[in-house]
UniProtKB/Swiss-Prot annotation:
Residue intervals passing through the bilayer: 15-45, 60-87
GO biological process assignments: ATP synthesis coupled electron transport
Residues involved in Cu cation A2 binding: 196, 198, 200, 204
Name of the molecule in the record: Cytochrome c oxidase subunit 2
Organism in which the protein naturally occurs: Cerdocyon thous (Crab-eating fox)
Modified residues (Phosphotyrosine): 218
Gene: MT-CO2
Length: 227
């Protein structure tokens, strides 16, 4: 869950988000070391009185600053590619949910059930109850079982949208005429908030997403009541 004046990423709830956080820290450390080295060299160049005017080239230095950046890029690319392949893998999902973006709300369909579908609209500010979050609460939450692989099929009825839930490491474009897919798995129960992350018109900011992750027994009870 995000909080005011937050500077870092949200706490990870899924294995993919855990991997993304580790990759972020890994890459940030490399960038920090490179920046420190460059600033150190610049400070030396600005403060030293020594000059080396007789040397026109230095092959050893050129070799180092050619090979070293290549090694650094490999160290960044390999874990990045690993995570990309992990995000694309969809192995035997336990549940499939289709979501469609509209101006300006989301609709959901549980394809494993005959008649389980609903629209999800933002609750206006004047109708919020004490403790509820402005611009993030919806009238119908997406209830899903925790610790199970869920496949999301995402598309749009009108313009470009983007279905994003940061704490699960999810962000998939909803494109008219195209069906994109992604998977999610929450490791603990709770409410997880997201929003449309693609400018889609005047009410773009009023398309929240709320996932309610519950144990399987609670999900089965909820789905039986909804059907």
């Amino acid at each position: 869950m995000a909080y005011p004046f937050q500077l870092g990423l949200q706490d990870a709830t899924s294995p993919i988000m855990e991997e993304l956080l580790h990759f972020h820290d890994h890459t940030l450390m490399i960038v920090f070391l490179i920046s420190s080295l460059v600033l150190y060299i610049i400070s030396l160049m600005l403060t030293t009185k020594l000059t080396h005017t007789s040397t026109m080239d230095a092959q050893e230095v050129e070799t180092v600053w050619t090979i070293l950046p290549a090694i650094i890029l490999v160290l960044i690319a390999l874990p990045s590619l690993r995570i990309l392949y992990m995000m694309d893998e969809i192995n035997n999902p336990s549940l499939t949910v289709k979501t469609m973006g509209h101006q300006w709300y989301w609709s959901y369909e549980y394809t494993d059930y005959e008649d389980l579908n609903f629209d999800s609209y933002m609750i206006p500010t004047q109708e919020l109850k004490p403790g509820e979050l402005r611009l993030l609460e919806v009238d119908n939450r997406v209830v899903l079982p925790m610790e199970m692989t869920v496949r999301m099929l995402i598309s749009s009825e009108d313009v470009l949208h983007s279905w994003a839930v940061p704490s699960l490491g999810l962000k998939t474009d909803a494109i008219p005429g195209r069906l994109n897919q992604t998977t999610l798995m929450a490791m603990r129960p709770g409410l997880y908030y997201g929003q449309c992350s693609e400018i889609c018109g005047s009410n773009h900011s009023f398309m929240p997403i709320v996932l309610e992750m519950v144990p399987l027994s609670y999900f089965e009870t909820w789905s039986a009541l909804m059907v």
